[in-house]
UniProtKB/Swiss-Prot annotation:
Pathway: Sulfur metabolism; hydrogen sulfide biosynthesis; sulfite from sulfate: step 1/3. Belongs to the sulfate adenylyltransferase family. Residues 303-314 have a biased composition (Low complexity). One of its GO terms (biological process) is sulfate assimilation. Residues 303-322 are annotated as: Disordered. Its EC number is 2.7.7.4. It holds the Pfam family ATP-sulfurylase. This is Sulfate adenylyltransferase. It comes from Riftia pachyptila sulfur-oxidizing endosymbiont. The keyword Nucleotide-binding applies.
Amino acid sequence: MIKPVGSDELKPLFVYDPEEHHKLSHEAESLPSVVISSQGPRVSSMMGAGYFSPAGFMNVADAMGAAEKMTLSDGSSSCSVLCLLENTDAIGDAKRIALRDPNVEGNPVLAVMDIEAIEEVSDEQMAVMTDKVYRTTDMDHIGVKTFNSQGRVAVSGPIQVLNFSYFQADFPDTFRTAVEIRNEIKEHGWSKVVAFQTRNPMHRAHEELCRMPMESLDADGVVVHMLLGKLKKGDIPAPVRDAAIRTMAEVYFPPNTVMVTGYGFDMLYAGPREAVLHAYFRQNMGATHFIIGREPPAWVTTTVPSTPRPSSMTKCQRAPWRSRSSCRPHGLLQEAEQDCDDARRAGSHQGRLRTALRHQGREMLGQGIAPPPEFSRPEVAKILMDLLPVHQQLILIWFSGKTRPGVGRWRVFLCAAGALWPEAVAVANMEKRSSTG
């Protein structure tokens, strides 16, 4: 099995030993404690689950290094992981504290931290980290606003994680740690594993994005990996996505070839930098290949200049742990009038691919009208109509017309999966450079 990033084995921070877990939970109730920001539980859950592997929340120097260069002061690769508080009045002079969950009633203890440093983060440092990650400091950007709405006091130190916030309780059939996914991959006997990141239900286009690389790579299986944290207004709620994806997988894929899972993290809408982070997660969970869309899922505002976006392939290849990654383009659809399977088998990318973006989901679902079969499988459409709240806006995309000039030349940009456009898709091979971590 492919090795985790920069290590021979995962380093989850969750306390798995039952006796130690009980002992630590009891101790935590007597420790000074702070209720952390709403972002904190997602980050601690990801560290506890083994999706990324810093020893805990970072000091400012390491967070700045991770934001600017994706490396820490010791040269290891990581993303920025900060615990930002409004103040430290509740901590006092304590060196060991309990971190409490703001997102669960009663604020249960998430983790225990051994404090190494308490530092003020300057406005300039916040601006640098914001710009490096999101490529904008516009407060209309949901990720920028969330990051900057936290306090300015960074508390750093190693942590021991005691629970996964609400994710495990609310999504018991879907939430999986990186450790659990690796174990399931081993149980299946898979050696070549394709991962697909999604914040949407899986429609015909998404289905084909999974099917084509599985066939061309002769992969053993695909792991559909859903975001279970916060999205933006208008995105489909996690329970609806879960039902739609499971139905699609059960009906339209061979048995024992699709693993439907989820993880407790928010969508950051951070463009190419988020692509690197998502690939990091997938390698740690055991995927050898990762399906990634052409355009970065970034938050568009009126004040962000419409300049060409950087190549996420370049971002990923320059990341220290992905220096020898590879990418191959795949066509998605030939003609909307053709069955997707026929289009895929035809192997031609000269068909009609003009996209039409239509905000008609609200009206169609409200009237009980299913989306076109070229867009969505009838079973998936029925679930969306049955379960999606009437007020939920759904963006439907289906395809007709001719390709744009130049699309046939396959200028592929590697970016975070989610904004999956029809003209191109890349499959990043994470196995070829695994020996370098």
